[in-house]
């Protein structure tokens, strides 16, 4: 994902009304604002392709990643301190050959749903705190200090929790893994407080405010070509 976590974590800004997330729906080809595309700084890679489509009598976001990188981000301003549950449906149609989340060379995902938190930098271990400060300086972005990314990854056992290969400030939760049949819809519901404490419980005893939610895919490291769908994404 080469520096991809910088773009992935860089979210803060637009006002959000009730419901907390604008739906992945609508008559257009892309979700309505405040959903917006976020790429790498000065990205030269192909962009991940997003499109609203009708599939199985429902509206869904189609995500295609031909050796690409890209995210759709929904910022919450001010960050929301009350939300505790995230739910959605998703379907992996085409997996990424060569993806391996535990290695930088394979740090790709055919589909990911991520939550970014306004976690206090003072709670980080000293070395990670200094790394994040440097990353913020170099990127020019107020990068959050914690993020959870839920992925569908046939290379990992379902239930795995892994640090990102580039930074421990991002943790992967593999919800659908090896043995999960592709081409079928799966429904997810996550207790964000429980997941955050599982990932970062040594730094905090409560869930920080949520600054953004994103949906994305990348295949820039593995050189693959993934295809997936996400629908009915709700934060409450």
What are the roles of these predicted feature ranges?
Residues 17-43, 126-133:
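Extracellular carbohydrate-recognition regions
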Residues 113-115, 228-236:
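Exposed low-complexity, polar/acidic, P/S/T/G-rich flexible segments that act as propeptides
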Residues 108-110, 118-166:
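Extracellular/luminal beta-rich ligand-recognition
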Residues 24, 213, 231-235:
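Extracellular beta-strand elements of beta-rich domains used
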Residues 75-86, 179-182, 206:
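Extracellular/lumenal carbohydrate-interaction signature centered on repeated Trp-anchored short motifs
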Residues 111-113, 168-178, 182-223, 227:
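Extracellular beta-strand ligand-recognition surfaces/modules
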Residues 48-71:
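Short carbohydrate-recognition loop motifs
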Residues 11-17:
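N-terminal signal peptide c-region/cleavage motif recognized by signal peptidases
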């Amino acid at each position: 994902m080469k520096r991809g976590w910088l773009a992935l974590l860089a979210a803060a800004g637009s006002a959000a009304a009730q419901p907390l997330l604008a739906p992945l729906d609508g008559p257009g080809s892309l979700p309505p604002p405040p959903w917006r595309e976020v790429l790498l700084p000065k990205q030269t890679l192909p962009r991940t392709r997003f499109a609203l489509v009708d599939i199985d009598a429902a509206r869904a976001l189609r995500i295609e990643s031909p050796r690409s990188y890209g995210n759709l981000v929904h910022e919450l301003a001010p960050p929301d301190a009350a939300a505790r549950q995230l739910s959605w449906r998703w379907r992996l149609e085409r997996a990424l050959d060569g993806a391996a989340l535990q290695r930088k060379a394979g740090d790709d995902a055919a589909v990911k749903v991520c939550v970014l938190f306004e976690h206090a930098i003072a709670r980080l271990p000293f070395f990670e705190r200094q790394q994040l400060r440097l990353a913020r300086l170099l990127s020019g972005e107020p990068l959050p200090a914690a993020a959870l990314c839920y992925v569908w990854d046939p290379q990992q056992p379902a239930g795995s929790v892994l640090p990102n290969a580039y930074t421990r400030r991002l943790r992967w939760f593999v919800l659908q893994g090896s043995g999960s049949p592709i081409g079928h819809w799966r429904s997810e519901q996550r207790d964000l407080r429980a997941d955050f404490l599982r990932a970062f419980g040594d730094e905090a005893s409560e869930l920080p405010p949520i600054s953004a939610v994103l949906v994305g895919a990348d295949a820039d490291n593995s050189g693959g070509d993934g295809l997936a769908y996400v629908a009915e994404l709700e934060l409450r």
